[in-house]
Amino acid sequence: MPVRRGHVAPQNTYLDTIIRKFEGQSRKFLIANAQMENCAIIYCNDGFCELFGYSRVEVMQQPCTCDFLTGPNTPSSAVSRLAQALLGAEECKVDILYYRKDASSFRCLVDVVPVKNEDGAVIMFILNFEDLAQLLAKCSSRSLSQRLLSQSFLGSEGSHGRPGGPGPGTGRGKYRTISQIPQFTLNFVEFNLEKHRSSSTTEIEIIAPHKVVERTQNVTEKVTQVLSLGADVLPEYKLQAPRIHRWTILHYSPFKAVWDWLILLLVIYTAVFTPYSAAFLLSDQDESRRGACSYTCSPLTVVDLIVDIMFVVDIVINFRTTYVNTNDEVVSHPRRIAVHYFKGWFLIDMVAAIPFDLLIFRTGSDETTTLIGLLKTARLLRLVRVARKLDRYSEYGAAVLFLLMCTFALIAHWLACIWYAIGNVERPYLEHKIGWLDSLGVQLGKRYNGSDPASGPSVQDKYVTALYFTFSSLTSVGFGNVSPNTNSEKVFSICVMLIGSLMYASIFGNVSAIIQRLYSGTARYHTQMLRVKEFIRFHQIPNPLRQRLEEYFQHAWSYTNGIDMNAVLKGFPECLQADICLHLHRALLQHCPAFSGAGKGCLRALAVKFKTTHAPPGDTLVHLGDVLSTLYFISRGSIEILRDDVVVAILGKNDIFGEPVSLHAQPGKSSADVRALTYCDLHKIQRADLLEVLDMYPAFAESFWSKLEVTFNLRDAAGGLHSSPRQAPGSQDHQGFFLSDNQSDAAPPLSISDASGLWPELLQEMPPRHSPQSPQEDPDCWPLKLGSRLEQLQAQMNRLESRVSSDLSRILQLLQKPMPQGHASYILEAPASNDLALVPIASETTSPGPRLPQGFLPPAQTPSYGDLDDCSPKHRNSSPRMPHLAVATDKTLAPSSEQEQPEGLWPPLASPLHPLEVQGLICGPCFSSLPEHLGSVPKQLDFQRHGSDPGFAGSWGH
């Protein structure tokens, strides 16, 4: 797998940088978009919300002139200066009287700072707010010694000046007076009021408020002076690569890769030559020879010294090499890198880099040879580097086999050195020359001579023979030509056989299992990567987009390690799944105010429905026109919301975007694009899943709806999938029958198409209706046209009532038994001609009754859903004159009574103003957790077709 590079894609870290610089300074600021018509507020921090008492939802999209903060005592001149500064895109300090949400007022010092993009155009404004009373209180609370010290400096300047110099009219006097005012600049560094010069509390109180206004309105500092910092203080609003410290080396840079390979070769050299040098090359004659010359006589010693220097340099480089923390962030700060290295591999690297043979050179001790040999083995600690460097290749089968073979050979080399050391140390003390070195000398004809230290086999003969013995013992071959004779040699041989059996069984016996295990993750990675590359090649994706795809895939793989969370969770029981999901989403469920007060069972049910998504910079989460079926919660990173490529809002951690589910019964469409500025982690939940859980916990639903604050509502107010049940008259979703304010709460209106399906005569006399989006109509004329249409509909209703009266005789012929007095019912008759007719059903002594005013029923007289389901016309709150609609055919016509329904009749239909809960007429979910007026939203009734249509008659049983 590739090197873990961390978050290296270009990111727009504008908001993150601002918040990070403001941390710990108690700033209250907001950000406004200068490219919008009213400079709308696109972000405000928590300090601003706490200062004024408004929530972020209430502040977003407000004009940055902050008219909602003004009151009756707010001076218009200050408001004008603020507006003029925003209009002219210039820096300004304004002292203004603002009001909090609780109607309390206070004097506020506002700093206006324009933000320019890379082209030099002002695109945003940062407005910082400070309570002037708090600033004065901070200055007055300084210690007496500090105030005396500041007064001594100011007093010496004023008392020892020339006569008339410090007068109030001179420039020096003005400067001194202004210096006594607590100066405020929008600093991103540590802000310390103790550093500002001022006089005593009494001198501060002498300055009149209008004088402060006069001096603060003429501030003309540049942005760099206002911010009092360098270039990295206020970043440009654009995609920026992660900033790296000047003298820091990236851990994935080409230089670091070459250096790592060089260090790897040096480690291998150390692992091979250190045991060989300690066992074979250090002897008494070698030590005496070294004592006669300098340290650089032996070439191998010089090479060891160079290797030690290289490892010391590597330690220094490690102190300046970036690393990736647990949040996948590239850390380049030198202090954090040093702390991380100290806690990690520093101790091992430091011990392995000590040149012990150089430190004890020419000590003159007899134990020098043994001590040097033992201390040289400390360099083997550098093998830990091999594990670190070669870990990335552990998933490749060929590399694993090669590493295993190298490990086997290295262990055999070490054992050979130990085998020779045992024979060499034991040989002088043996009475009978039976050691393996003496046997080797006899076989080679190079016997040892006690008087000649240089006698015996050569170093090469001894090393090759020892290596041959260890390899034959490890592989359990053992030809016997080199055999252990002494007890020490036999004990060592037993240990070698045990090690060999374990290595042989674990490595060579399980090669196929090792390859299969190591290939499992790599095979999945390369399979997915191959699909991505084939997709890029087939569709000819351009290089910039191709790089984004590959980087996102690699980052997503390192983020999830190729684990499919859904597949993993399916293998566990539901109770354990809920616990796992509750742990994964614990930060959101614990800190979001909307979920406070929820029981453990409710939180578990919500956690199962939540999904986690990760977005790289530049990724579009929601497009314009997308159906808003998901609610998003930001847990890390920042996003921007754009309309026509203009930023209308910037959201960060703990913000929520989508649509307020409680205000709309059906999902709407997005009115903007949502794009990630940085690497973002988001929690999302489907609308239907949220409502399903809240239906199961109705007690928590009310608390949730009241506490849920959607930071930015993406719903397009001009349209949606279905018309909202509580849309105001004049909306484009329905233009037929409109209800009054109190009637709109009771039932949704019936559209003109519904009425024309029942009575086709209406359609002939109605004027042609144009789409509200047609350019022929002016939106200002809609109320007049709607009023005229209502009058026409009223006239049509009057004519329909007269027709009902004329058809009374026909209804009387169909009655088989008398009806109770005081009630009149209406049925829809479908005779053989398949023509629908609205006719009343009444007894012979019952008059049709007075017509309904305006053709509508008051809400209290409208039948409820439960009454309709029970098919019972008994309504205590219903008027005696309220009609009950029923559908009848030639075969099922029967008298309709208020006390019973004859068999064969359809259940009584509701008022035309009510949704019908008849199977086949209504489609759509009903969520009891929604507010009462959004509980059930029917689709349009299937009454548009005329009764003569055969399909219509078939639907009623013909």
From Swiss-Prot:
Q: Which residues lie within the membrane without crossing it?
A: 464-484
Q: What Pfam families does its record include?
A: cNMP_binding, Ion_trans, PAS_9
Parts of the chain on the Extracellular side: 283-298, 362-370, 420-463, 485-490
Task: Explain the purpose of this protein.
Answer: Pore-forming (alpha) subunit of voltage-gated inwardly rectifying potassium channel. Characterized by unusual gating kinetics by producing relatively small outward currents during membrane depolarization and large inward currents during subsequent repolarization which reflect a rapid inactivation during depolarization and quick recovery from inactivation but slow deactivation (closing) during repolarization. Activates even more slowly than KCNH2.
Q: Its quaternary structure?
A: The potassium channel is probably composed of a homo- or heterotetrameric complex of pore-forming alpha subunits that can associate only within their subfamily.
Which UniProt key words apply to this protein? Cell membrane, Glycoprotein, Ion channel, Ion transport, Membrane, Potassium, Potassium channel, Potassium transport, Transmembrane, Transmembrane helix, Transport, Voltage-gated channel
Q: How does it sit in the membrane?
A: Multi-pass membrane protein
Glycosylation: residue positions: N449
Free-text tissue specificity from the UniProt record: Expressed in prolactin-secreting adenomas.
Catalysed reaction, written as an equation: K(+)(in) = K(+)(out)
Q: Which gene encodes it?
A: KCNH6
For this chain, the family text in UniProt reads: Belongs to the potassium channel family. H (Eag) (TC 1.A.1.20) subfamily. Kv11.2/KCNH6 sub-subfamily.
Source species taxonomy = Eukaryota, Metazoa, Chordata, Craniata, Vertebrata
- What is the protein named? Voltage-gated inwardly rectifying potassium channel KCNH6
